[in-house]
């Protein structure tokens, strides 16, 4: 078991801390610059009720898996008068939820499929190391340079069970896969290896062709476009 004194220790004055970029029930996250440089980090500040044991547990879990490209990297700790803070890799595009909202009309299907594969790859790494995240949702998944980063290995919580409705024009195979992952009985849900296998078999061209054909049909109903066939372009 790791001890806090074995981690790289930073002083609070080593960073120029910026306003809060995210917060939860037990901690807040700030962006921060290292000294007088443009090197940016994320500082996770725990509240006063977080115990040293809980903090050590979160650090241990991160250090077991942060070699993976889709898991946020742990850089060190800061100890001040009241509590500890974690120094973490900074994700320049924020949470996946925020990223999808800001790019809802422009994000391509290929990017969506890439993100899904990266999330599955990160989860597989956790499971290979016998770690269950327990609180994986779009606000605990970050995007850095168009790459997924899973974060927040703190306390577990129970979500409200609300499931999103399929977004129009989403690839049918993709919808079928994530609906299987939502099944109420755990033994009816696919294993993570099966999820990755099925994601690798999803053909983004099918979704693209569907959208082109749908648009072609719409244009055929418009005056002057009866002979239009976008599938040739």
Regions found by a protein language model. Give the residues of each.
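Protein kinase glycine-rich loop
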Residues: 18-29
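The N-lobe alphaC helix and its flanking beta3-alphaC-beta4 segment of protein kinase-like domains
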Residues: 47-72
